[in-house]
């Protein structure tokens, strides 16, 4: 079962592709017009992550972000939406600078996913592949298309941030 959606490109002309590769795995790919070092920093430096991680259209705000970005380190994000809060937390399983991040998503207990993000640079551009592996089909179904749509929006926001960062560096 491969389900694929390709969304409209942003001003940089890059598309985000969302694929459900199996009953348990969701894969999101996008090329960014920035070196892997810069894209990786946007994922691992809290002051940068805060600028793009929250989908603007969803009316959410990021109340707090704690991240010890190293193998074995922990993270915790607290969001506010419609007068309620949501927490996301887990552990960094692998951190390989400028090439790979792997973390657990523990807020759902045994139904948590494992996220792997790879950064592959070619000619100053970075192919980012994000794989979310869920423990079951039901867990992935429960995440629904909302999570995929949010990721598409946040990747567009990341694209905008990288353009700004590239102009500053």
Q: Residue spans of the language-model regions?
A:
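Beta-strand/loop substructures that line and gate deep hydrophobic ligand-binding cavities in soluble
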Residues: 3, 25, 102-153
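Short beta-edge strand/loop motif at the mouth of beta-sheet-based domains
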Residues: 27-28, 47-85, 169
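Hydrophobic/aromatic beta-strand elements that line small-molecule binding cavities or substrate pockets
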Residues: 30, 64-67, 88-94, 105, ...
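Hydrophobic pocket/interface hotspot
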Residues: 39, 49, 75-77, 92, ...
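Short, flexible helix/strand-to-coil boundary loops that buttress conserved ligand/catalytic motifs
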Residues: 43, 53, 79, 105-107, ...
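Short, conserved beta-turn/loop elements at beta-strand boundaries and strand-helix junctions
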Residues: 96-101
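Short, highly charged C-terminal tails/helix-capping segments
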Residues: 162-169
């Amino acid at each position: 079962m491969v389900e694929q959606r390709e969304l409209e490109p942003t001003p940089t002309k890059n598309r985000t592709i969302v694929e459900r590769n199996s009953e348990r795995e969701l894969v999101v790919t996008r090329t960014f017009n920035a070196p892997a070092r810069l894209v990786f920093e946007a994922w691992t430096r809290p002051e940068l992550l805060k600028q793009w991680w929250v989908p603007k259209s969803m009316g959410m705000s990021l109340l707090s972000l704690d991240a010890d970005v190293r193998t074995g380190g922990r993270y915790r994000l607290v969001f506010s939406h419609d007068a309620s809060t949501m927490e996301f937390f887990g552990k960094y399983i692998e951190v390989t600078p400028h090439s790979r991040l792997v973390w657990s998503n523990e807020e759902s207990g045994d139904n948590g996913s494992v996220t792997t993000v790879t950064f592959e640079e070619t000619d100053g551009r970075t192919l980012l592949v994000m794989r979310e592996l869920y423990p079951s089909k039901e867990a992935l179904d429960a995440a629904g298309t909302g999570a995929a749509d949010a990721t598409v929006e946040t990747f567009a926001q990341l694209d905008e941030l990288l353009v700004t960062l590239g102009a500053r560096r």
